[in-house]
């Protein structure tokens, strides 16, 4: 009788099979628990303790993955255009540094610039790099100075005051300065852009500027990349292109400051209730206040190089340094020294603070001549025009006088205003000296200055009839 036997490997023992499966499962779990960087294997815990640990620690790796990696410095620089004048296009930011770096600035000379997104022409001007995705920076030349007043036509004379719409202001003088600036090789410029970021095409632009009361006329025709003077310019706008042989009477009709004053809208309730910008008077403060304009009244400044400039200084504006050249009106210092003895001198300009404040720091560093300074932000904006409302001074208007080469500037207090001829370069000018006797007499009388100013200059007689 033959017995059949099986080999040990072929015997099916259920106990051994279960043990083998358990060993294989534990081996795979140990491999899964091994850390990525090596190290001891972690035991795969089960039960209540394991559930608690998973509940506490389970969401941590997910949060770490959701947190983005820190941005590099180059990537952070992409967001710098949020604080510049460059219009936003809505496209993905270009990962290229668009930054202006100033190098050493010595003795008031403008330093050189490094602009990674612009090419430098042979004449020293900057040309936007077409390879970059960001639109060119908006040109802001001339905006630091006092703007030219917008023509107040019958079509818009009923506009409300305080409508801050600088886009409606026809700053013809500033456009002329832009044309002059682009002819100077040493000064950096950039292409003007529209509000949607598209650059204006180069076209022949004829600009005629009748500055203030028609005393100076500038006419230039040039091929330049310039924005339109206004959007749009009405046919009867005073600063549209005019014939070169226009007479003085025609120029006066182009922009009559007294027509502007006649139709200026009244101040709003909010403007009437503005808090005074000046501190209260002290015992040493003179009783009478004299408000002085800056540009073309005391000085004449230009971004073009002036050979007879009394001083020059750099101004940093919108990441670009502009060199400002200054002429001082004859008897400028003598006038201020005498008037500061009997008047509280207040400088009130429609220019930017970044320019005017720096100029005053040079002319009057110890504030011995000018006690207070007010700038464009203290003006009232009416239809894009900046008007100096004397109520913001917080002073007695019966003892307050303003001297300005633009009568429109004191449109709300015409009886307090003394007009003065605009000054640019006449070395024989003595208008400041001629005003000293009258100003000294007003203090001696110790009366309301307004009737005396009205009788002397008779500005109300120049207003057009109703």
Curated annotation (Swiss-Prot):
Keyword line:
Hydrolase, Protein phosphatase
Q: Which GO terms describe its molecular function?
A: phosphoprotein phosphatase activity
Every FCP1 homology domain range: 283-442
Residue ranges, compositional bias (Basic and acidic residues): 60-79
Keyword Phosphoprotein in record: no
EC number, UniProt record: 3.1.3.-
**Which leading EC class covers this enzyme?**
hydrolase
Q: Where is this region: Disordered?
A: 1-137, 216-240
> Matching InterPro entries, A to Z?
Dullard_phosphatase, FCP1_dom, HAD-like_sf, HAD_sf, TIM50
Task: Report biased composition (Polar residues) as residue ranges.
Answer: 81-97
Instruction: Say which family it is in.
Output: Belongs to the CTDSPL2 family.
Role according to the record: Probable phosphatase.
The protein here is known as CTD small phosphatase-like protein 2
Name of the gene: CTDSPL2
């Amino acid at each position: 009788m033959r017995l059949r036997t099986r080999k040990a490997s072929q015997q099916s023992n259920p106990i051994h099979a279960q043990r083998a499966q358990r060993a294989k499962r534990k081996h795979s779990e140990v491999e899964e628990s091994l850390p990525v960087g090596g190290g001891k294997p972690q035991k795969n815990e089960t039960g209540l303790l394991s559930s608690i640990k998973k509940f506490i620690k389970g969401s941590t790796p997910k949060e770490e993955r959701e947190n983005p990696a820190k941005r590099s410095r180059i990537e952070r620089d992409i967001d710098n255009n949020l604080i510049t004048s460059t219009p936003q296009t809505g496209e993905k930011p270009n990962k290229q540094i668009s930054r202006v770096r100033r190098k050493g600035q010595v003795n008031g000379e403008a330093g050189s610039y490094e602009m990674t997104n612009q090419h430098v022409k042979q004449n020293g001007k900057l040309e936007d790099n077409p390879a970059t995705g960001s639109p060119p920076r908006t040109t802001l030349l001339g905006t630091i100075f006092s703007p030219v007043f917008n023509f107040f036509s019958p079509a818009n004379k009923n506009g409300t005051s305080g409508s801050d719409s600088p886009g409606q202001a026809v700053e013809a003088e500033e456009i002329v300065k832009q044309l002059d600036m682009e002819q100077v090789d040493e000064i950096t410029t950039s292409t003007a852009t529209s509000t949607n970021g598209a650059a204006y095409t180069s076209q022949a632009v004829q600009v005629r500027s009748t500055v203030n009361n028609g005393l100076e006329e500038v006419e230039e025709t040039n091929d330049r990349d310039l924005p339109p003077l206004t959007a749009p310019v009405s046919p009867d706008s005073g600063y549209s292109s005019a014939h070169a042989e226009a007479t003085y009477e025609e120029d006066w009709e182009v922009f009559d400051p007294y027509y502007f004053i006649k139709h200026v809208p009244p101040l709003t309730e909010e403007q009437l209730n503005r808090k005074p910008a000046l501190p209260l008077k002290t015992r040493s403060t003179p009783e009478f206040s004299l408000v002085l304009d800056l540009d073309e009244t005391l000085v004449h400044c230009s971004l073009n190089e002036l050979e007879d400039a009394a001083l020059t200084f750099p101004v940093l504006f919108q990441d670009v340094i502009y060199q400002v050249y200054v002429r001082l009106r004859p008897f400028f210092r003598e006038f201020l020294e005498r008037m500061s003895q009997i008047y509280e001198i207040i400088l009130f300009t429609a220019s930017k603070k970044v320019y005017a404040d720096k100029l005053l720091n040079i002319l009057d560093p110890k504030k011995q001549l000018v006690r207070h300074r007010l700038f464009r932000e203290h003006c009232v904006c009416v239809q894009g025009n900046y008007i100096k409302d004397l109520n913001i001074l917080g002073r007695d208007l019966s003892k307050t006088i303003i001297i300005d080469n633009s009568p429109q500037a004191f449109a709300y207090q015409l009886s307090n205003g003394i007009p003065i001829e605009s000054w640019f370069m006449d070395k024989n000018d003595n208008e400041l000296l001629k005003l000293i006797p009258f100003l000294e007499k007003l203090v001696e009388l110790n009366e309301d200055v307004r009737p005396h100013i009205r009788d002397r200059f008779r500005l109300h007689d120049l207003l057009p009839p109703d």
